[in-house]
Amino acid sequence: RQITAKWNKQQFSKGWRYGEGEALAVVKPGTLLEIWKILKICVKADVIVIMQAANTGLTGGSTPYDNDYDRPIIIINTMRIDNIHIINEGKQIVGLAGSTLYDLEKKLEPFEREPHSVIGSTSVGASIVGGVCNNSGGSLVKRGPAYTELALYAKVNQNGELELVNELEINLGSNEEEILNNLQNRNYNKSDIIQSNKLASDNDYSNIVRQINSNVPARYNADKRLLYGVSGSAGK
């Protein structure tokens, strides 16, 4: 789905709280593979890409901000891709690009578990991925910031080429199309999930938050300790 009419783009180019600017188009892919194909076109055309989920406007990072950019902007809205896979008997989940904290909360209820974050925008569709990209801690001090070393993401390498990085620790295939389709359709078995030592949460937080005499806050933005892959990437 592609949106180019100015009036129809407004709900995507203007944040609920703040942030507003012009975008050449808004694209709403329905699969992970469609995101990949759109990104390839955008990289080749040398346009700015803003990845967007619910556009809650809490951080201002999911919309253009003013109109002083040096290149056209394409907004890729991921909310159609909202699958959540429960794995390892409910101990872990795989949240696709547009999956939300609200849906995660419902899916975890049978396992008597709760999401990593409870934030003000949970009820309006705040995404799991958005929280990880911003190390969002939410309103509950005891849960700490969102953090993972397990992710599948695209990046532009030093040669200006689009590259798919699989750090998810799930065997999904050998090429981009195979990997993305297998993940989208949950075409993997328990035996494909690698039991690694990579972290899916901030395991130091429980100690840090107890340091009541420290001059350093337990949680703060751009904490270098929590920068890894997509974690703390601010959606870049």
What are these regions (language model features)?
Residues 51-55, 62, 78, 97, ...:
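Glycine-rich, histidine-containing beta strand-loop boundary motifs that form or position
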Residues 1-44, 56-94, 236:
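N-terminal flexible segment immediately upstream of the FAD-binding catalytic core
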Residues 23, 29, 48-51, 117-120:
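Proline-rich low-complexity regions
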Residues 85-87, 97, 101-102, 106-236:
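FAD-binding subdomain of flavoenzyme oxidoreductases
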